Amino acid sequence: MGGLFLGFDTSNYTTSAAIFSEDTGDFILNYKKLLPVAEGERGLRQSEAVFSHIKATGDASEAIRAALNIAGGSSGIRAVACSSSPRSADGSYMPCFLVGEALASSVSGTLGAPLYKVSHQDGHVAVAVYSASRIYSFDADGFFSHPFISFHVSGGTFEVLKVSPSLSSKRIFDV
C-alpha cells in the first residue's frame, strides 16, 4: 500500500502546498496562492514576500486539512518536503523559503514523518519530468538515470541546466 506525500513551496510569488498519492499516482491537492504585488511595482521585497506567506499559511493549512479529511486522515503521510533555497548551490538563500521550511518542519515533527529539503529549482525540474511522463507515457524514474538538459524559467530567471543522476543516497538528481 502506498502513501501520501506532502510538499510546500514558498517562492517569491506563490504560496504552494501539494499532496501526492502514491496509490493513484495523482495529486489530491494542488494549492497555489499568488502573492499580491502592488500595481506599478515590479515584484516583492523579501520582507513583503515573507509577510504575505505567513498570512497565506492559514488558507494553505485549511486546504491541506480538507484534502486529508477526504483522503482518510494524516496517518497516510509518509514524508513531507519543502523548498528551502532557490538552487542547490552553496550560499543560495532567500528568506521567503523559511516560511515553507518552518511549516514543513512543524508538520513533519507533529506527524513523525521524515522531512526532505530540496531547492525550488529541483522542484521545477522534477515536476516537469513528472508532467512529461504523464503526457508522453514514459518511466519518470528511469528518465533520471541518464543526464539530460532542462530549461528552467522561474520568476526573473532563465537557465539551461545539465541534470545528472545523483551519486548521493539523499537525492535523485544533481543540477
What positions do the PLM features span?
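Short acidic/glycine-rich loops and adjacent helix/strand connectors
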Residues: 1-175
